[in-house]
Design a protein with these regions (language model features):
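Membrane-interface helix-start motif
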Residues: 17-20, 50-53, 183-190
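Conserved beta-strand cores of small sensory beta-sandwich domains that regulate signal transduction
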Residues: 84, 115-117, 197-199
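Short, acidic, Ser/Thr-enriched surface-loop or helix-capping motifs
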Residues: 119-120, 202
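Non-catalytic regulatory/interaction regions at protein termini and inter-domain linkers
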Residues: 1-21, 36, 52
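Extracellular/periplasmic juxtamembrane segments that couple receptor/chemosensory ectodomains to their
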Residues: 167, 171, 227-276
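Extracytoplasmic/periplasmic ligand-binding sensor regions of membrane-associated signaling proteins
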Residues: 110, 121, 125-190, 194-197
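Solvent-exposed, extracytoplasmic
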Residues: 95-112, 168-228
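Juxtamembrane extracytoplasmic/periplasmic/luminal helical "stalk" adjacent to the first N-terminal
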Residues: 20-97, 108-114
């Protein structure tokens, strides 16, 4: 009897232990489910926060490029207007008065305005500034029937912009702008994040402004294929095709940090809009 009672007691202990273990498993399962639910909720909140942050960043980038586009258009329009009004005044003056007028303008608008060159029938009749004439036209964009905007090469340097005006009386007026001086003064100080920067291209994809001098004047695709052989530019090329259509948009694409050693690959976000 004693043996049987011990057996019963052991069975009760075993059952009691099993019940306790069952409760433990149930509690553990419940806690695991609760933690999993919290993780799912937390992950969902984090994704929404991240997506919201990305959307805000894209909106800010688009506002920045649209603002810069407007500022660049105003700058070009002001220089173009100055050329027309200065010519209207200067072509009635004598030679010395004309030189003084243009020299004063170049000095007051330096270092961005570097030179003014006036020619008639291909012959230079006036120069103000450094007297360095362009040797090669790398890009040309028409503003109107008499005015165009160019990227030109002087010596071995390709960071010069030029407004070229054809007068009604047969003269041509070329205003040479130091593009890097303009970039450093107006564009580089703008905050676009830790690694962001602004770039200006023409309608054919030729780089007109870039934080790196060696990239001025290159084709944004073919030029980089030569500078960085072996890079996959498919995603970048697709985005450039959309830019050439004159669209205003924000794209995510795969590219490279061209300004960093070795140009490491990276997922990028680019906001773009027509500049003129």
């Amino acid at each position: 009897m004693e043996k049987n009672e011990n057996c019963k007691e052991n069975r009760f202990l075993s059952m009691d232990s099993l019940k306790k273990n069952s409760r433990f498993y149930l509690v553990a399962a419940f806690l695991a489910a609760a933690i999993l639910a919290l993780l799912c909720v937390g992950n969902g909140i984090w994704k929404e926060y991240r997506n919201s942050a990305v959307r805000n960043q894209k909106d800010q980038m688009l506002l920045a490029v649209e603002s810069l586009s407007g500022r660049l258009e105003e700058t070009i329009s002001e220089y173009a207007s100055d050329i027309r009004s200065m010519w209207s005044c200067s072509h009635t003056l004598n030679e010395q008065e004309r030189e003084t007028l243009w020299d004063t303008y170049v000095k007051e608008h330096g270092p961005v305005v570097q030179d003014v060159i006036i020619k008639k029938k291909g012959e230079t009749i006036l120069t103000s500034g450094t007297d360095n004439e362009p040797e090669e036209i790398l890009s040309e964009s028409k503003i109107d029937d008499q005015m165009c905007f160019r990227l030109v090469k002087i010596g071995n340097e390709s960071h010069y912009l030029m407004l070229h005006y054809e007068t009604d009386t047969g003269e041509t007026i070329s205003m040479i702008l130091n593009g890097m001086a303009y970039y450093n003064k107006t564009i580089r100080p703008l905050n676009v994040g830790t690694n962001g920067y602004f770039i200006l291209k023409d309608h054919n994809g030729i780089v007109l402004m870039h934080p790196q001098l060696e990239q001025w004047g290159i084709d944004v695709i073919n030029g980089r294929e030569k500078m960085f052989p072996g890079k996959n530019l498919t995603s970048l090329s697709n985005m450039i095709d959309r830019q050439k259509q004159g669209l205003t948009a924000v794209d995510e694409y795969y590219s490279y940090w061209w300004t960093k050693p070795g140009a490491p690959g990276v997922e990028k976000v680019s906001a773009y809009t027509p500049a003129y």
